[in-house]
């Protein structure tokens, strides 16, 4: 932006001279606070987007206003605007992406992480006095940002696929939220971590796997952490533990309880067919719903059954205990008042919350004082709220680029993208951020024109954003 000849003739030939003149005219050390306000539009930013630092309540009778980086250092000037001459002068911190408007607002295009920081607007009156100094902090988040708000580290979880497997079948223990800085991962049979029960380990740096003492020859460990169990038997029922180690030697554990459904088995072994088993109905529940922990194959001569919250059958975790002989019910420390116990051993959880997620344990005792134990995992999620989608520019030229960003107020959700009400088919010109909340089209083509939406979902619900139409223009 060039300075007018009239302005130049008055001696405003450089940014440094402008700042010197302003500093001589103003009482810099004692600025007057006025009612000027600055708002970031939009308030949340991801790399590649544009932002308007919108100014309101600009004082009257101003001569100039100045934008600069930081709070007090005027040598970090971005641009100065002379209201007398309706002309702006760029400063040393002007990157070529900033546009200064007569109303004081500053437009910054294609922001990067380096644009994060304080921005200050100084206004100067016609008599050369500082009227106001107003600052705003601009936060630019990278593509690793969970769009909408910084997300706590995702919890390492394991899912059984399928949820129930018959003897002779295969099951995948699918790992979710594996960290990027992974060094190694180890699988164990049971809840404890020691060498004797190690199934296998995988080193990501070498992309190599080693089998442990508990390896049966039927397991395959994958680089994404998942474990495939083939030709399962009822003896494979039980807990499995995944241990991960990152490059900073920080360890994390996750557990899953595998149930082998012997009732689906083609064999006719009566012993296998009476194995105690629990199914959560439904497998995934929304907050406020009910979950029935449905018991199968309860021993015929059972005398007592006990329910516990967690995997350990100790008094502090006891929910309830029922004696069939005396028809007596005793609630434990972990009883919340929302549980209903049925005479077939099943337990109903009412008005569940996310805190009810986790393992539950059933212990049965028969007339011969034989004890059987079974475990079940409960999964409770919040209902998803509607996400909001933004685009850097809804009208782009062919060969240009555009960034769509999906903002969700929910944590633990997944994101998928829709194009003209269909699942978006990614091309080599498109990239997704690691969390999939940001979609970038690098070289736009005519066929990219249309309506884009993002969908936020978890196992119990999903919501789709309002559509944003992209218009593609010829060069």
Swiss-Prot record:
Positions of the Ig-like V-type domain: 44-140, 162-260, 280-380
Compartment list: Secreted
Glycosylation sites: 103, 110, 231
Alphabetical keyword list: Angiogenesis, Disulfide bond, Glycoprotein, Immunoglobulin domain, Pregnancy, Secreted, Signal
SUPFAM superfamilies: Immunoglobulin
Leader sequence segment: 1-35
GO cellular component, one term: extracellular region
GO molecular function: syndecan binding
Disulfide bonds: 406-454
Function: May have an angiogenic function during early placental development. Binds to cell-surface heparan sulfate proteoglycans (HSPGs), and stimulates secretion of the proangiogenic factors VEGFA and TGFB from uterine dendritic cells and natural killer cells. Also induces endothelial tube formation in vitro.
PANTHER family to which the protein is assigned, alphabetical: CARCINOEMBRYONIC ANTIGEN-RELATED CELL ADHESION MOLECULE 1, CARCINOEMBRYONIC ANTIGEN-RELATED CELL ADHESION MOLECULE 19
Protein name in the entry: Pregnancy-specific glycoprotein 22
Organism: Mus musculus (Mouse)
Lineage: Eukaryota, Metazoa, Chordata, Craniata, Vertebrata
